[in-house]
Each structure stands twice: as C-alpha cells, then as structure tokens.
Amino acid sequence: MASLKCSTVVCVICLEKPKYRCPACRVPYCSVVCFRKHKEQCNPETRPVEKKIRSALPTKTVKPVENKDDDDSIADFLNSDEEEDRVSLQNLKNLGESATLRSLLLNPHLRQLMVNLDQGEDKAKLMRAYMQEPLFVEFADCCLGIVEPSQNEES
C-alpha cells in the first residue's frame, strides 16, 4: 500500500500546508499555534523504530537512506497496468475540496488512526482493524463516495 505522504501532506491541526515537523513524532504542522495544540496530545512513541535508528547513527551529519523496497513497490504500483485502481487527478482534487471529508479529518482520533496507518509496518493488518471502527468506516465511505460516486449509488 502506498504511503499517504505524497504531495498532499497537511498540518495535523488545521489541514493547511505544513512548514515544520514535530521533532518527537514527525507529524507535520504549520505554525507555533498548531504545534502547541499538537504537543498537548503528541505521542512520541508512535515512532519508536526511528528513535532506535537515530540513536544508532553516528553523530556526524549523514544523508538519510530511503527505504528502497518501499520506493520500488510504490514505483511498481504507479507503473502498473491496472488503471481502474488509480485515482484520477480530478478525483484527488475533489477529495481535497470536500467539506465533508475535511470536517471528518478534524477529528483527532481519526487523524491519529491515519498517522498510525501511514507509519505502521503491517498496513493491511491495521486497515482490517480500522475498518471495524465506525469513524474510520465513515471516512472510507466518504472517500469512496467522492472517488467512485456511481458505484456507491448502486449499492
């Protein structure tokens, strides 16, 4: 499953374009005000693997190494011939402009679920678990309603 960190990264508090990342958990935020709000609920333990890696790195400046497997699998997915699995640019814009979707994303619990899903190692397992949560199902249904409106109306 592709990472959610593509070109649509938004501030975890106000959903605006972020300028910074939390030093503890690496979630994006756009201002001091948003950082202060985030800091109240920040859980630095959401990134324990990164902490271990950083503590094992030498103290001199080293360019971070990208996860080659993730890059390859994303590239394979993007280059696949399965056009029906791709979301058009127009539908991506529609997702970004949806007031309903934006209001759902204001929920801190849903946002934490999304961060956990994005950062989790077993995304398929997390997705199965999250699809048991009514809030996440509402979010998924909203996204599908925007991306595939005709299929949603038939069911």
Curated annotation (Swiss-Prot):
GO terms for molecular function: nuclear thyroid hormone receptor binding; zinc ion binding. Its main location: cytoplasm. It is found in: Cytoplasm; Nucleus. The keyword Ion transport does not apply. InterPro entries: BCD1, Znf_HIT, ZNHIT3_C. Keywords: Cytoplasm, Disease variant, Epilepsy, Intellectual disability, Metal-binding, Neurodegeneration, Nucleus, Phosphoprotein, Zinc, Zinc-finger. The modification Phosphoserine is found at S80. PROSITE patterns: ZF_HIT. A zinc finger (HIT-type) spans 11-42. One of its GO terms (biological process) is regulation of DNA-templated transcription. One of its GO terms (cellular component) is pre-snoRNP complex. CDD domains: zf-HIT_ZNHIT2-3. Zn(2+) 1 binds at C11, C14, C30, C34. It comes from the Eukaryota. Zn(2+) 2 binds at C22, C25, H38, C42. It is linked to PEHO syndrome: An autosomal recessive syndrome characterized by progressive encephalopathy, lack of psychomotor development, severe intellectual disability, early onset epileptic seizures, optic nerve/cerebellar atrophy, pedal edema, and early death. Thyroid receptor interacting proteins (TRIPs) specifically interact with the ligand binding domain of the thyroid receptor (TR). Requires the presence of thyroid hormone for its interaction. Interacts with NUFIP1. Interacts (via HIT-type zinc finger) with the RUVBL1/RUVBL2 complex in the presence of ADP. This is Zinc finger HIT domain-containing protein 3. It comes from Homo sapiens (Human). The gene is ZNHIT3.
